Amino acid sequence: MRVSKHYWNSSGAKPAFTAPEQFAGSRLPLAGGFPQPRRRPPEDVNPASAPLPGEGIARQAQHMHWVATWFLLRIIRVCFIIKVSNLQKMHSMSKTVKALLTACALAAAAGAAIAQEQVVNLYSARHYSTDEALYTGFTKATGIKINRVDADDAGILARLKAEGTASPADVILLVDAARLYRGEMDGLFQPIRSKVLEDAIPANLRSLPVADGGISWFGLSTRARLIVFNKAKVQKSDVDTYEELADPKNKGKLCIRSGSHPYNLSLFGSVTEHLGEQKAEAWLKGMVANLARAPKGGDTDQIKAVAAGECDIAVTNSYYLARMMRSSKPEDVAVVNKVGVVFPNQQSWGTHMNIAGGAVARHAKNQANAVKFLEYLAGAEAQNYFANGNNEWPAAKGLNIDNPALKAMTQGQPFKSETIPISAVGANITKVQQMLDRVGFQ
């Protein structure tokens, strides 16, 4: 069965039509003997504005509560009638009364089932098809249904601000440390205490605790920011640190995506934390001078450009390279054979690791279920999905992975990753954006 979603017109009155809800499931219809609920929109929501995608999650929950209430009111009324009629004093009940009470019991059960349905409403920036297995696994393990809305990081944060207290979101999944930090600073997440999460996720891969010890967000998977190079033109020793991307010896050799992309902003925020603002700005200026072409495309485009000879060195997230390494397409195999890979700064602070992470929404209506979902994502089953399905490293401590591409990148050996708090990277982003403007990094 399907549930209908109500739209409100500019006057606040309920219109004469309904539209199908986008979230299918076992629902009672607004049909038959059920009168339409008369609700006004929340005071802080403009009824003239069009409903946001997924707004039906909240409407659906309101309707379930109303239907359960409708059933319970009928039960009370029936019981009152029975008492008034003094039927309880009868030595035997007629078939009619028995049928009536049976109907009461069935109605109560149906209402309770609707009222107690377990759900968690997810806003996710993870657009990876392999994550479907995560959601299925969670529902199978807990019985909690996931209602999901997909958007990019910036879109999700903007939507949470617009929805305010009316937001149906319970869990937020974002794919960049800087955006997680921004959501925390904007008050869009609620700090939580979870021994499961705090034991599993290292302190440097989560937000700093608030006064009562609560954590606003947790990293759930990691990805390295790597340097790739053309093996026929460049020696690995010439690009084994991030600093060498700005060295004059590499003038005219560098390809990179836009400096304002979140993956680069986080890298630049990390370098700023290590070098200080003055040296970091000089480094950014040096990279601009070393560009082989204006920044464009995504990380995969940079890898292909190195293989094609358009540039000699480039910067990419590890999972983009891993995808190509696991591909059987001849063109991908040819690219991989031409490029080498560097995990930068192994002799100093270590390779920058960005995160994908999660938080409980500030106005979560299903807070307990939200915490359960984050705890599930930090468990061994989900962490292995991240590694094998999307070529990410687990954020949780003490897990071994069996991803052939990730092993090949590191030649089966551990590598040194930076240990600065990832929240410090997010705190540097405003400075980084100002520096990019000053040095003309597009």
Put a short name on every predicted segment:
Residues 180-188, 210-240, 268-269, 353-359:
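Periplasmic solute-binding protein
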Residues 402-442:
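Extracellular/periplasmic bilobal clamshell ligand-binding domains
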Residues 123-126, 212-217, 229-231, 237, ...:
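Short beta-strand->loop
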Residues 356-419:
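Mature extracytoplasmic/periplasmic domains
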Residues 167-172, 190-227, 243, 254:
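A structural signal for short loop-to-beta-strand junctions that line the ligand-binding cleft
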Residues 259, 263-266, 270-344:
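Ligand-binding pocket segment of bilobal, Venus flytrap-like solute-binding proteins
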